[in-house]
Amino acid sequence: MRSDMIKKGLERTPHRALLKGTGVPQSQMEKPFIGVATSFTDLIPGHVGMRDLERYIEKGIHSGGGYAFFFGIPGVCDGISMGHKGMHYSLPTRELIADMVESVAEAHRLDGLVLLTNCDKITPGMLMAAARLDIPCIVVTAGPMMSGRGEAGRKYSFVTDTFEAMARYKAGVIDAQELQVCEDNACPGMGSCQGLFTANTMAILTETLGMSLPRCGTALAVSALKRRIAFASGERIVDLVKDNVTPRSILTRAAFENAIRVDLALGGSSNTVLHLLAIAHEAEVELPLETFDILAKETPQLASMNPAGEHFMEDLDTAGGVAGVLMQLGDKIKDNPTVMGLTIKQLAASIANVDETVIRPLSNPVKKEGGIAILSGNIAPKGAVVKQSGVSAAMMNFTGTARCFDSEEAAMAAIMEGKIVAGDCVVIRYEGPKGGPGMREMLAPTAAIMGLGLGDSVALITDGRFSGGTRGPCIGHISPEAAEGGPIALVEEGDRIELDIPGRRLQLLVDDETLAKRRRNWQAPAPKIRTGWLARYAKVVTSANTGAVTSAD
C-alpha cells in the first residue's frame, strides 16, 4: 500500500509517532489509509449537510476495513459570488481544489480517497484531482435541493424566482410583496440548486462517468438514501484500494462520450464543456471541443429540465435518474467500467421502469438535437458554446445590432436602465479566463434580459461563460478571448452580428479589410488584477476551447 511509506520500517518511527499523536491506534496501522476530502462549509446551501454525510462515509470506511482521515477543501457558491468581484474567483478555485487534493494525498501517501463534493467548481476540481493522482477514488455528491413550495402547489426555483424575478419587479410585472415571497421560498433548505444547473449536471455526469455509486447523482440532499450512498461509498473505496481500481481505468474516451451524451440528452449546463475538457486533460484522454457538436447532432434531447423546462431534480430522480437516461439512450451508450462494480450498461439494465413523461424515449424527443451546440465563425474562430436547449425557436436564427461592453457591470447597468432594446446583440468582452480574470458567469445580465421579456428579441455573446441557470440566446466561451486579441475585441458599437445555431455559425458582418484595420489599431488592455492568486492565474490559464486549464508551459 502507498501508506506503507509513512508507517512501516525503522525509518518511519517518527511518522508513526505523529500518527499516534492524532489518535491512530497501533491496531489500525495495517489498514488502508483512506482520505476523505470534504468540502463542508456553512456558506453554501449545497454543502451545509455534509457533516452528516461525513459520519456515514467514515462508518462505511471503518466497516469496510479501512481507516478514515478527513481534510478540508474550500468551496465557493456561484450564486452568492455572482454579479460582483467574487465571481472572478469561482472558476480559478477549480484549479486550487485539484491542487489541494493532490497535495494532501501525495504528501501523506493516502491509499485512496472519498471526494465529498456538490457545487459548481468543487465537483470538477475533485474529479480533476482523481484523474491526475490516479489512485483509487470514489465521489459522493451531496445531492440536490428540493424545489421551493408555495400556494396552490406552485414550485419555486433559485434562478427563475430570484435573478429573473428581480428584473420582473424592476419592470413592474410583480410587486415588492411578490418579490419577497420569491426570495423566501426559492431556496427551502440544503442541497445544490434545484434545476439542471451546473452542480446537478456535474453530479449526474460524475455518475455517468462511473465515479460515483448508482442514484448518487440525483438522490436529494435531505433523503435517507443519500446517507446510505455515503455509507456504501465508504465501504466501496476500501475494495477499490484492495483491487487497485484507479480512475484512469474508468475515465476512458468511452466514459467521456457517455457523459457528453447524457449531458446533451438532459439539456445540461454549458459549463460542463469546460469541465469535461479539463477532466479529460488530467486523465490524458484526447477530447476535442468538436466532440460535443458531433455527438449533439446524433443525440436528441430527451428531458425538459428547469431552468428552460418544467422538471426539477426531484422529478428526474423518481423518473429513473441516471440509469433511466442511460436506458432510454440505449445503443448510443458505450459500455465502460465504474466504481460500483457494474458496467455502465449493467447499470442501465438495472432499472425496471422509466417515467417517460420526464425522460422521453428516442422515438419521442423534446428536441431532435442535444442541448449544447458548438458555434464558430469570424468572431469565434476557435469556437463558442450555446445551450441550445434553452433557446426559443424564434432566436435560433437572429441578426442583431452590437451593443459593446467591456465588463459585466457595464452591460448590467445598461440592461436595467432600459438601454437595451429588441434587435440588440449585447457583447460582453474582456471577461475570459485571462481577461476577467476568471471567466465570470453572466447570469445577472441574461436573467435580466429574460425577466424584462427580451428573451425572444435580444441575444448576448461573451468570452465569459454562463450559469447552468441561464436560459435564452446566450453564446459564451468565445475563443480566442478579447484579452488575447480575439476578434470579439474588434467588434464596434452598431456592427451587425449574425447568429445561426442550426448552421453552427456566429458571424460578425464586417469585411476582412475593416477588421484588419481595426486589428492594427487594437492594443491589449492592462491586466485588471496585478497581485495575488488571480494575477498568477491569468498568466497560466489556457483558452476556454481547451477547458481553461492551467499550464506550466
Curated annotation (Swiss-Prot):
[2Fe-2S] cluster binds at C119, C193. One of its GO terms (biological process) is L-valine biosynthetic process. It comes from the Bacteria. Mg(2+) binds at D78, D120, K121, E441. The modification N6-carboxylysine is found at K121. Pathway: Amino-acid biosynthesis; L-isoleucine biosynthesis; L-isoleucine from 2-oxobutanoate: step 3/4; Amino-acid biosynthesis; L-valine biosynthesis; L-valine from pyruvate: step 3/4. InterPro entries: Dihydro-acid_dehy_C (IPR042096), DihydroxyA_deHydtase (IPR004404), DiOHA_6PGluconate_deHydtase_CS (IPR020558), ILV_EDD_C (IPR056740), ILV_EDD_N (IPR000581), IlvD/EDD_N (IPR037237). This is Dihydroxy-acid dehydratase. It comes from Geotalea daltonii (strain DSM 22248 / JCM 15807 / FRC-32). The gene is ilvD.
